[in-house]
């Protein structure tokens, strides 16, 4: 059964309601940050205090940590905890290769979700990513798989990921376009129909627009929850519980 992070659903709902009733100015729902922009181990200033302060004060309810592989940074555990303690929900995106080895540097928190990139179960890294997912689940973390749609997508590759998510008891599935090409974005829309949970389908669109943004600081500024894509929701949505 899929778990939905209660803190995440609550923060997104509050932000949407505030914007609908104009009690809060329009702003980003999701803010992306590359830890390489903030963490500089070995230098005279290992942490950019100015950028860290701006990040902690950011009004977006969700912070997506991605870009360069976060687990390559020695201070990533403290970095994640600082952001989560500031009141943000945090998604830490990783290829999962080093997740099992470094899982002890993190603490399960209601505000933290570990997002493991997994486009195919046949890739060379999939075995290590699977072990990382298992270690995270056994340690009590919220986990999601992030699958990216590329131009050369094999339409069958995601059909094997779907039963894998159920079998491994992963909490969610995000599917996003890897580029802004019209054909790729269209394929991502079609692929998202494989996601049983309507919440994760909608959140996939939040993440996709944020990651595809060309601005130096990538943000998703559209707080609208439903689009025409949601017309295709499946009638038999899987069991979901808030945790």
Question: What does each model-found stretch correspond to?
Answer:
Residues 49-65, 73-177:
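Radical SAM/AdoMet-radical enzyme domain recognition
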Residues 32-34, 64, 147, 176-177, ...:
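Short beta-strand segments
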Residues 21, 133-137, 165, 187-199:
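Hydrophobic, Leu/Ile/Phe/Ala-enriched alpha-helical segments that form helix-helix packing faces
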Residues 45-46, 124-125, 185-186:
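Short, polar loop/linker segments at the starts of domains and inter-domain junctions
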Residues 22-24, 106, 232:
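Short secondary-structure boundary/capping segments
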Residues 178-243:
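A C-terminal junction/extension of Radical SAM enzymes
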Residues 1-45, 215, 220-223, 227, ...:
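N-terminal pre-core extensions flanking Radical SAM catalytic domains
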């Amino acid at each position: 059964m899929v778990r939905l992070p209660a803190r995440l659903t609550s923060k997104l709902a509050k932000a949407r309601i505030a914007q609908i009733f104009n009690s809060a100015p329009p702003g980003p729902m999701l803010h992306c940050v590359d830890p390489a922009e903030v963490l500089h181990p070995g230098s005279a200033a290992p942490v950019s205090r100015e950028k860290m302060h701006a990040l902690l004060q950011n009004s977006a309810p969700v912070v997506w940590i991605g870009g360069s592989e976060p687990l390559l940074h020695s201070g990533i555990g403290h970095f994640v905890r600082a952001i989560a303690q500031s009141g943000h929900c945090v998604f830490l995106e990783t290829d999962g290769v080093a997740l099992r080895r470094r899982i002890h540097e993190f603490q399960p928190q209601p505000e933290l979700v570990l997002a493991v990139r997994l486009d195919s179960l046949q890739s060379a890294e999939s075995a290590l990513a699977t072990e990382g997912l298992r270690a995270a689940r056994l340690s009590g973390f919220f986990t999601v798989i992030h699958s990216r749609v590329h131009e050369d997508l094999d339409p069958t590759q995601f059909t094997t990921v779907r039963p894998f998510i159920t079998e491994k008891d992963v909490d969610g599935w995000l599917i996003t376009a890897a580029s802004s090409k019209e054909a790729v974005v269209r394929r991502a829309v079609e692929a998202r129909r494989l996601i049983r949970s309507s919440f994760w389908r909608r959140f996939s669109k939040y993440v996709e627009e944020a990651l595809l943004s060309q601005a130096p600081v990538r943000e998703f500024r559209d707080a609208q929850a439903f689009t025409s894509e949601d017309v295709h929701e499946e009638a038999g949505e899987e069991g979901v519980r808030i945790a």
